[in-house]
């Protein structure tokens, strides 16, 4: 009626791109050892634990002030942190917040050491999208600042995705909230209650 004779159905390039990234995910022996509790170089007799791993991606201090105290108080999970800013002074700040845990840094550790660690800090760029493969729950930083970072890179691995309140302008985050795959937190109490629920699932 309006003169259109040919129509192409085009997908969302954001989703197409993140699926391509997933398919090209890097194998990270250090992250694998961190999750399983055993390095590939170790004897097959060493038991695999398959620890629960919480991946914090592109986090900022307001995010870390919520999730780090929780993991200081709760056992049974391992914490993998990839900050948005990896300046040395910022990494030292994180180290000062972590209490009673064995912490290793990605560029300074081995799979054997990572297998024994409680916290793995990523102190280099280019690994985040591949890291989510080794997690069970993801936290996306920025929600207490200018806005959350990429939620799709985590969601594509079929894990719960947690983020702060500044998410209203992000279509992907809104979709996750509506589908039940995303969770907004505003306070430590929100986070603690949510994690307790996820731990019991």
Regions found by a protein language model. Name each.
Residues 1-201:
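Nucleotide-activated sugar donor-binding and catalytic core shared by glycosyltransferases
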């Amino acid at each position: 009626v309006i003169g259109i004779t040919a129509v192409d159905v085009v997908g969302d390039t954001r989703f197409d791109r993140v699926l391509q990234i997933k398919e090209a995910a890097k194998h990270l022996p250090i992250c694998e050892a961190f999750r399983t509790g055993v390095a590939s170089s170790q004897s097959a007799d060493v038991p695999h634990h398959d620890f629960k791993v919480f991946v914090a991606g592109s986090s900022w201090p307001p995010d870390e002030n919520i999730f780090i105290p929780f993991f200081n108080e709760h056992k049974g999970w391992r914490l993998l942190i990839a900050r948005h800013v990896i300046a040395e002074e910022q990494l030292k700040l994180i180290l000062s917040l972590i209490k009673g845990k064995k912490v290793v840094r990605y560029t300074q550790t081995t799979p054997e050491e990572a297998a024994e660690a409680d916290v793995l800090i990523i102190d280099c760029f280019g690994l985040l999208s591949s890291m989510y493969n080794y997690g069970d729950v993801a936290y996306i930083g920025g929600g207490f600042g200018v806005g959350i970072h990429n939620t799709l890179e985590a969601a594509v691995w079929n894990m719960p995705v947690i983020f702060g309140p500044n998410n209203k302008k992000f279509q992907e985050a809104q979709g996750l909230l509506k589908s039940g795959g995303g969770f907004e937190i505003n306070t430590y109490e929100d986070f603690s209650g949510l994690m307790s629920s996820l731990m019991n699932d």
